[in-house]
Regions:
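Sec-dependent N-terminal signal peptides of Gram-positive bacterial secreted proteins and lipoproteins
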Residues: 2-23
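Active-site-adjacent loops and short helices of periplasmic peptidoglycan-processing enzymes
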Residues: 23-186, 193
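Generic low-polarity alpha-helical segments
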Residues: 13, 191-192
């Protein structure tokens, strides 16, 4: 069953990495309908971007072709839930029942609408975490596996160290802003490769 959930997680991550953007073609410099094949020799021909940080990588060799500020620490927001899911899948049984605490039920941001005393399986909460970006599900799962959000964040940091992520630090399971909760574009890419 964990293999199925891992497959769903990978599929969702792929979907989350693609955004559709529509805009009027003002200057006809680049036809975004065409696929741009990027190689080390034509990197300078890439369209200009206003992104503060990014990486372009070869998904076959799993190597970076070019990056911009790829090692600069910044907030990771809801992509935090990738590591939350990894730790939950390693530490919990999908059929375990979780009782929602007052803290989980009162978590802000995007929510499933869980309330104190609600009961749900780890599996159902993971679906809510990854499909609906449920911050309340993230806290409920963190408390269930780690005993508290703080202890669960330590499990996330241990996993990050195990993966060699030296510029990543977790404070929460959901990614709501905290100055000590950060990663880099490069290390975020590494997490997505799992």
């Amino acid at each position: 069953m964990k293999k199925i959930l891992y497959s769903i997680l990978i599929f969702l991550l792929i979907l989350l990495n693609f955004s559709t953007v529509c805009a009027d073609d003002v200057d006809n410099e680049v036809d975004f309908e065409d696929t741009i094949e990027v190689t080390a020799s034509n990197v300078s021909e890439l369209p200009k971007t206003n992104s503060r940080r990014y990486i372009v990588y070869d998904r076959i060799s799993k190597s970076m072709i070019i990056g911009k500020n790829e090692d600069v620490k910044s907030a990771m927001a809801s992509t935090t839930k990738i590591m939350t899911t990894i730790v939950i899948l390693e530490k919990a049984d999908l059929n375990e029942k979780v009782t929602v605490s007052a803290k989980a039920g009162g978590t802000g941001g995007s929510r499933l609408g869980l309330k104190r005393g609600d009961k749900a399986s780890v599996r159902d909460l993971l679906y809510g975490l990854m499909l609906r970006s449920g911050n309340d599900a993230a806290v409920a799962l963190a408390e269930h596996v780690g005993g508290s959000v703080k202890e669960f964040a330590e499990l996330m940091n241990e996993k990050a160290i195990e993966l060699g992520l030296t510029n990543t630090h977790f404070v929460t399971p959901h990614g709501l802003d905290d100055a000590n909760h950060y990663t880099t574009a490069l290390e975020q890419w590494i997490m997505k490769l799992l």
